[in-house]
Amino acid sequence: MKTPFGKAAAGQRSRTGAGHGSVSVTMIKRKAAHKKHRSRPTSQPRGNIVGCRIQHGWKDGDEPLTQWKGTVLDQVPVNPSLYLIKYDGFDCVYGLELHRDERVSSLEVLPNRVASSRISDTHLAEIMVGKAVEHIFETEEGSKNEWRGMVLAQAPVMNTWFYITYEKDPVLYMYQLLDDYKDGDLRILQDSNDSPLAEREPGEVIDSLVGKQVEYAKDDGSKRTGMVIHQVEAKPSVYFIKFDDDFHIYVYDLVKTS
């Protein structure tokens, strides 16, 4: 698992750090916005770039300028300046304000949008979403490690890929899981917690935390703030969070507190 933009040593995202599938966060009222990184002034509305291939430069502080190419997966409705991106050669999904973040330079929208592909097994795809799984990864030394996680959804735009997160690393990843399943590298678990979603009456509205500002207390006593940007349809208690100081998308089963 790799991380762009030099966030981890040697370009690798650690698969050994402890993570939490269920955390307690505090809903907060948003004060005057405080950005760790400066943003460009807003300009005239731009065309829709969801589904487009892009490339741009990236320079954070004194680090050297690097070049990145990827696919824009989504524009976040509760923060339209924020885009979800899958960069070539990297497994995480990233959240960036492409038109505002001053670390992004020379943004170019490449010709031709990403063409949709046919799912090889729609039945398996439907069964897989919302399920606990064991995902097998091969290390550079050739040994295999099993990672328990949850398949969250079929990814937008790149529709043969799936969103997934892991108990020990609660960040949003995406893989071609149907291929992994057929190769024996993905096993769907028979988990007692994977009960069908509760039936809802027609027109019933389920409370959502999407758009809420959150404050997360870390083990060292420090706090970080962010926004809930998405609710997982297959598991309504599970949400995507974009923290102000990070471009990863975090996935938590939220416990609402006052």
Swiss-Prot record:
- InterPro entries (UniProt xref): SPIN/Ssty, SPIN/Ssty_sf
Q: Where is the site labelled Histone H3K4me3 and H3R8me2a binding? A: 169, 176, 180
Question: Gene3D superfamilies from the entry?
Answer: Spindlin/Ssty
List cellular component terms (GO): cytosol; nucleoplasm
In the record, biological process GO terms are: gamete generation; regulation of DNA-templated transcription
> In this UniProt entry, which cysteines form S-S bonds?
none
* Annotated region described as Tudor-like domain 2, given as residue ranges: 129-178
Region annotation Disordered: residue ranges? Answer: 1-23
Q: Which GO terms describe its molecular function?
A: histone H3K4me3 reader activity; methylated histone binding
- Region: Tudor-like domain 3; residue ranges are 210-255
Region annotation (Tudor-like domain 1) ranges: 50-99
Note down the stretches annotated as region Histone H3K4me3 and H3R8me2a binding.
138, 246-248
Q: How does it assemble?
A: Interacts with C11orf84/SPINDOC.
The family annotation for this protein states: Belongs to the SPIN/STSY family.
Q: What does this protein do?
A: Exhibits H3K4me3-binding activity.
Would you tell me the protein name for this molecule?
A: Spindlin-3
Q: Which organism is it from?
A: Homo sapiens
